[in-house]
Amino acid sequence: WKTEDMLSGIEGVMYLAAASGEDLATTSDIVTDALTAFGLTAEDSGHFADVLAAASSNANTNVSMMGETFKYCAPVAGALGFSVEDTAEAIGLMGNAGIKASQAGTSMRSIMTNLTGDVKLSGAAIGDVTIATTNADGSMRSLSAILADCRVAFGGMTEAEKANNAETLVGKNAMSGFLALMNAAPEDIAKVSGAVNNCKDAAKNMADTMQDNLEGQLTILKSQLQELAISFGDLLMPAVRSIVSGLQGMVDVLNAMPDGVKRVIMIVALLAAALGPVLIIIGKTLSL
């Protein structure tokens, strides 16, 4: 992002950094990378920060681990049109089952990839079930709706049937993550879903709570200083570029000089360096 973009979305990111205990640079990377993958802009950074704050505070995970998960699955989620909220909800539910960070990321990526076609499930009690993943116009249904329909079907299966269907649908590596989503308790689903879909000012509220202790205040101060550095960096960049350009010009001139001239300059420089201490000693002697 350009500096103007970074500054336009810095407030929400700064609140998230303060709330999570992460530094501003790390939090900014998490937010900007995910927003880009979802096709969102800097103006959405405040809302995305709120979603992360709400999910991490209502599930067994944190902002850093969620950021790692988004790194793997956000490009696929964005391409399929899945929302940030639904993706964060699924990440939070996986976190409750101990599946976090890159493990959750690879699982989510595989799950989403395998939801591009109709989901076909079977069991002794439910028979053959087909769950549509697309709308009539060809667009993807919401991730939460697809998973909700899958949970209904899985609710009528034996444990062995659940494992077999999960492996068939998403593969061995991702089946543990998918089963975590299928076996999530209704109250946990309602808690995380309610939090991410009603998350306005969640990052700010968490940051305000953090300000009640020294660690939180220091984190906020550090974030504010980093924001100030970004602002000053933008203002000073023209001057710095001018200085660097001038130095490059001097170096070019020196490089273009004949070797004889370079040797003379080097000898003069060495003599000047040697004469300095001598002149100081002479000056002190004469002053006695």
List each model region and its residues.
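Low-complexity, glycine/alanine/serine/threonine- and acidic/polar-rich repeat/linker tracts characteristic
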Residues: 1-5, 9-26, 30-47, 51-68, ...
